[in-house]
Every structure is written in structure tokens, then in C-alpha cells.
């Protein structure tokens, strides 16, 4: 892990290359924010339990893999990605896959 003041960077395998990613968490005075939830974050459930807000860069599997570990956290995503984050059907529609 790298620390820069209140910013923690948890390095995934292969320096964060796909599919592991790197987990960035910013600890503020009132809120703890995670940027994306890559595979690397699945090994840091202790940290994820502290997260209040998740900001998703976009809805690819390597950015949302550990989102299920933070049901307590609010999630922010681009307006065009919201349906894909909310349900499996929304994700299928987002990527043009046949509905389940």
C-alpha cells in the first residue's frame, strides 16, 4: 500500500493491470471515498467497511468487481451508467447483450 496523507492506494497484482486494478481510497474528516472497486479491493474488506461513498469512473467489470462488499455505501456514477449499476438487466442493456 502507498500512502499520501489521507490518500491510500492499494496496489493490485501486476501493478494494477487488468483485471486486478488498484484501489484508491481518500479518508476525509467526514467521509471516506473509494474510487472504483477493482478486484484488488476484495482482499481489503477491513478498509471497505469504512467507505461511505463509491465514485465509479465507468461501468466495466474491473471497476465494479467489489461493489457488492459495500452495500452500506452510496454510489455515484455517470447518468448513462446508472441503470447498468442498478441491475443485471440494466448491465445487459447497457452493453447490448441479450436480456437474461
Where are each of the predicted segments found?
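Active-site HxH/HxHxD metal-binding segment of metal-dependent hydrolases
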Residues: 20, 42-100
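Conserved beta-strand hairpin/beta-sheet module of binuclear metal-dependent hydrolase folds
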Residues: 1-46
Amino acid at each position: 500500500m502507498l500512502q499520501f496523507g489521507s490518500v491510500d492506494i492499494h496496489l493490485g497484482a501486476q501493478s494494477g493491470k487488468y483485471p486486478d486494478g488498484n484501489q484508491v481510497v481518500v479518508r476525509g474528516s467526514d467521509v471516506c471515498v473509494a474510487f472504483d472497486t477493482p478486484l484488488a479491493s476484495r482482499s481489503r474488506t477491513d478498509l471497505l467497511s469504512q467507505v461511505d461513498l463509491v465514485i465509479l469512473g465507468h461501468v466495466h467489470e474491473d471497476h465494479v468487481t467489489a461493489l457488492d462488499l459495500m452495500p452500506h455505501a452510496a454510489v455515484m456514477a455517470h447518468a448513462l451508467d446508472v441503470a447498468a449499476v442498478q441491475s443485471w438487466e440494466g448491465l445487459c442493456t447497457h452493453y447490448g447483450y441479450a436480456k437474461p
